[in-house]
Design a protein with these regions (language model features):
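Residue-level detector of conserved, function-critical positions
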Residues: 50-309
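Intrinsic disorder/low-complexity segments in short proteins, especially the signal peptide
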Residues: 11-13, 23, 43-47
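Short intrinsically disordered, low-complexity coil segments enriched in acidic
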Residues: 1-6, 203
Length: 309
């Protein structure tokens, strides 16, 4: 838009000069258009140079090897072949060679060394376009994004913007939960809740730590948009979509229901599988029933106390 305005401005100026001098019938005063053409050419060249070329990843007969082409289907990068690859996101494309993932730039040069067992694209999984997720020691029997293994976020130059966590969950709402553990999940029944030796915290979409890793359990694989039920020092509470406490971690158990989604922390964590006791009139949907010392307090999904239930 800036260059278009510039061109239109110079064209309008030239037309005004032309009309003025033609009216006076003094053609010798008409200024040549060459400077204007030069400025327009420079503007267009600068505009074109600022854009990345249109490059596309293709597969040979629908599988490996992968290669890249221009918009006309011509192979680029000297017919380079990769075991696997993804489309360019901005000026970076993830590629795999000799079993390791990294990133290349639009010239085909290595932008991030091929040294990871798996990586996502920049801006993927809800993260900012300036960061990408990388993993090592991925469990081949698990979907990579859900594999608990050394996981970090890197910038476009390959610098780590987070330490290696045991797990980084995709961004939900406004933060992504991370776990600083290394040992596998504490309990196969609770593999969506926590690690044996780590705790949960939160990073923002750019990878900045916004909530310290202090929660031993968190319900993450269950759809509860806007809040997350967590446990700290054996007590349950609720965080909002930014990872901030809206119900303090002082309760013995939590019950929540919406449609087919049911969270019953007492049934999930007790060996006997005993459920949270229902209040008079039963449980209502989209309310948080927090139990402490045999008494039940009720909260909305925003953390507001409900009375008279």
């Amino acid at each position: 838009n800036t260059y278009k305005s510039l061109i239109l401005s110079y064209s309008a100026d030239y037309r005004r000069i032309l009309r003025k001098n033609t009216t006076r019938r003094n053609t010798s005063d008409i200024k040549p258009m060459r400077p204007y053409i030069l400025l327009i050419s420079l503007a267009l060249s600068s505009c074109a140079a600022s854009q990345c070329p249109q490059l596309y990843m293709n597969r040979t007969r629908g599988s490996a090897p992968c290669y890249f082409t221009d918009e006309y289907g011509h192979a680029v990068f000297g017919n380079a072949r990769y075991e696997d690859a993804r489309q360019f996101i901005g000026d970076r494309a993830a590629v795999r060679l000799n079993g390791k993932w990294g990133f290349i730039d639009p010239s085909g040069a290595t932008a991030v060394p091929l040294q990871y067992d798996w990586c996502g694209s920049f801006g993927e999984y809800g993260f900012d376009k300036s960061v990408a997720m990388v993993k090592n020691e991925v469990d081949k029997f698990k979907v990579p994004i859900l594999s608990d293994c050394p996981t970090a976020l890197i910038d476009r130059k390959g610098n780590r913007v987070t330490p290696f966590y045991g797990f980084i969950f995709p961004v939900r709402d406004k933060v992504a939960f991370v776990n600083d553990g290394r040992t596998d999940f504490a309990d196969t029944r609770l593999q969506n809740l926590g690690f044996a030796d780590g705790k949960w915290g939160c990073v923002d979409p750019k990878g900045r730590l916004v909530v310290p890793c202090v929660y031993e359990l968190a319900y993450l694989l269950i759809a509860t948009p806007g809040f997350t039920i967590v446990r700290r020092d054996g007590k349950w509470g609720v965080l909002n979509d930014r990872g901030r406490p809206i119900v303090p971690c002082v309760y013995d158990a939590v019950y929540y229901k919406e449609g087919h989604t049911v969270i019953d922390t007492q049934a999930d964590t007790s060996e006997a599988g005993k459920s949270v006791a229902a209040p008079n009139g039963g449980f209502r949907e989209k309310l948080l029933y927090m139990q402490k010392e045999g008494e039940t307090e009720i909260f909305t999904e925003k953390g507001r106390r409900v009375r008279g239930q």
